[in-house]
């Protein structure tokens, strides 16, 4: 019964008491919760509200924006500026930082991908929002990108909202991972997935196989071994998954194990990779590590990568710890022979 479940707000208050906090973190999370509820509503309305299709514009990445990309970005900016907890924000959709006017006392910075996987939205496949929270460094200017360029290990919290058959918000504050499901009847996120842990054993991998011709040898080696199944060196059959929505991929891995790869390849290597360090890789790495998994570029721990720009791209390999470590070892062996 819903009334017997812990609400996300109550959960945050419990965390606040445990840590002896002032309440400012609970307040800023409340803003994110409202933003995710509003985006969920707009995603669910879809074609009924004229929300599908392209917006006729491009984002800073040079990617065509969907109508819901623009709407979700506006919702995140507006809702999270109201509370005054954030000194500044940065979005995957914006070229520069977004200073929050009238938030002189703001102690935190918010980075977000307002609508991950939006290429799927017109065909009704799950999409999501990803967010990362950092502390504003002492004496830093929240209007400068330098304040945001902190490695992933500096994150205070990270999470994502998944807009699928139900809407979920998955969150870590550095004390494990918990999942909350939106009950539309009462308008609240309720704790449904406490202490989420990635299973150690896995028989699934997620990769865009259409890019195989661009892969580096260590990635080819790993995928080839998985494909060989019981007859190969792994001694078991694997299944391949690919949704083209990072939130959906990571959520599946949190629930039943697996590994997600968007590796460096010969086509994207000059850009550093495909996915964005600050908006996608770091928050997901924090969540995955807190759930007992691992996240790497293939050549180092994701959350230790020094950021050089707001829109820096990196290779991403994350999921079940043993699989991620195996892929990292294959990269090390390959590099040692070059």
UniProtKB/Swiss-Prot annotation:
Gene name per UniProt: fbp
Location relative to the cell: Cytoplasm
UniProt keyword annotations, A-Z: Carbohydrate metabolism, Cytoplasm, Hydrolase, Magnesium, Metal-binding
GO molecular function per UniProt: fructose 1,6-bisphosphate 1-phosphatase activity; magnesium ion binding
NCBIfam families, per the entry: PRK09293.1-1 (NF006778), PRK09293.1-3 (NF006779), PRK09293.1-4 (NF006780)
Pfam family, one: FBPase
Residue numbers binding Mg(2+) 2: 113, 116, 280
Complex formation: Homotetramer.
SUPFAM superfamilies from the UniProt entry: Carbohydrate phosphatase
Enzyme Commission numbers on file: 3.1.3.11
Pathway: Carbohydrate biosynthesis; gluconeogenesis
Residues spanning the membrane: none
Co-factor remark: Binds 2 magnesium ions per subunit.
Cofactors (names): Mg(2+)
GO cellular component labels: cytosol
Catalytic activity reported: beta-D-fructose 1,6-bisphosphate + H2O = beta-D-fructose 6-phosphate + phosphate
Name of the protein this chain belongs to: Fructose-1,6-bisphosphatase class 1
GO biological process terms held by the UniProt record: fructose 1,6-bisphosphate metabolic process; fructose 6-phosphate metabolic process; fructose metabolic process; gluconeogenesis; sucrose biosynthetic process
Binding-site residues for substrate, renumbered to this chain: 116-119, 208, 274
Signal peptide start-end: none
